[in-house]
Amino acid sequence: MPDGRPTPTGLEVPRWITLKSSKVRARQGPGLDYRVLWEYRVASLPVQVIAETREWRKICDPDGAVAWIHRTVASGRRSVFNHSDQEVMIHAGRTTGSAVRARLAPRSLIALDECEEGWCRVRARKMRGWVQETAVFGTQNTALCDASRPAGPGQG
């Protein structure tokens, strides 16, 4: 944990999770009494946990929005998201000179296996390859949103 304080789960914050289903309610606070701000409609979307209670996770999404979701709609499986309007090349190896196996379309998701030395190994069906870590959302080690910020749309 960056500040050394224990979390309710014992896991580090920030950390990456994905949304389990294509219908996840984003709330203003950590509880069913809080207003639903919007609904996520994309299963496997990577989001960053920036704070938590025992039952609720405060998340930062690819658009910089902050909201609370219940722990049961979160998964520890990893994916990355092409947040840009350009295709991201999926290479055979960890160099830009290696063969391009596929292209990740803008605003697309792909499963993440691991990241090392600035490259992330990704997979979709039988295809496996490497993308540059800086080209996708879902790998950053630092908090992307301020945990003290109230829930609401991105500020950018």
Q: Can you name each region flagged by the protein language model?
A:
Residues 1-28, 39-43, 50-53, 60-65, ...:
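SH3-family beta-barrel domains
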